[in-house]
Amino acid sequence: MSKDEKKSRSKKRGTVSMPLVNPNAAGIDIGDSLHAVAVPPDRGEVCVREFGAFTEDLEKIATWLKQCKVDTVAMESTGIYWRNLFAVLVQHGFEVYLVNAKHTRNITGKKDDESDAQWIQKLHSCGLLKSCFLPDDKIETLRTLVRHRRSLTQDSSRYVLRMQKSMELMNIKIHTVISDMTGKTGTAIVKAIIGGEREPQNFLPLVDSRIKATKEEILKSLKGNWRSEHLFLLKQCYNLYQHMQTQIELCEQQIEKVLQSMTPDEDIASQSTRRKRSKNQPRFNTTDYLRRIHTIDVTQIFGVSEIGALEILSETGTDLSKWGSEKRFVSWLNLCPNNKISGGKLISSQLLKKKPNAASQAFRMAANSQKTSKNWLGDYFRRMRSKGGQKYAIVATARKLAIIYYKMVRYKQSFTPFDIDQYREKYRLAKIKYLEKALKQLQVAA
């Protein structure tokens, strides 16, 4: 055998051929000011080009891809930079895959924009990339507004903490005597302080009769050193808090308009007919909107509040069949173990280290609220806590809630909770069956 034949044979053995699933695929590496675009090598002399990020540049990208006869495009979900290019490509009729950046990592030592774009194009042409979940236009609008409302609520709470800090620096301890500084009594006292009142005795008429603290405790808490700089900070923080509350109300009006566009033309029950509004809940009748959108009441699920159900809707939409199964749904929410198996053995089962989205956080908060409840879910939470700790119990219970939500929304099933005695009996019988099976295995081994 000649040397040339040996070399050609060794080359054939070293190469791995992958079937082309998407022969007309392109890959784009997204950036803030530059986008690198790669097309198949047989589409021209130049298969990788860099474009700017202005609107006219995005149109040039779409035009060039049309000239190269590309019909499907893959791009990384890099920050928010992908959004405008994604919208332009969809308008021009391309099938666009938005891909998790972890799934497109290039070989170490070959990191630059052009090689990344070529690598994405190669993976996409071989059908190795999966598109992220993307909601429709209405859900996208709702998600943007609900996320903005959440940010406003968090900013609002920061100003409350700064108000408390200002009073603490003046040794005004009223925030340790009453439970809520933004309630009726707390707001009245802060407004009086800003208005110039300094005598503790004059604050007593502002105290609501439902406050549990005694008059003596309230009087003691309102004696301090009234420093001008801290009074100025208190006034500014209070005004900013009120401003944030106004902005939250305006944001809720926009959210309600979106919900109205998603529901049939029927009258929504007024605020007076809904259950009592808790703190930080929307000012409109969220439950009725959700009931009409889903045709079932998801707020009946243990621990799921109105704002929690609204956040889940804004993140997942109304069509949960996109996930295929409840297992994929809880995996997307990062509420199941990331099992790593090697040699037939489980070597790791920890959760993926990624920030949970708003829907996952809503399920976790609902699960945490069940730790002292006297229903079957609370019993399950406490059993999981004794097994693996608080965090383990929250994730396990949140997974239960996510599965219940998935079945209710997708299959239009009503929430039918177990009786706690029946649930405990079911668990007892299952444990007996497990122990009997383990005993038989030990007897066989002996």
Regions found by a protein language model. Give the residues of each.
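A detector of single, family-specific signature residues
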Residues: 1-446
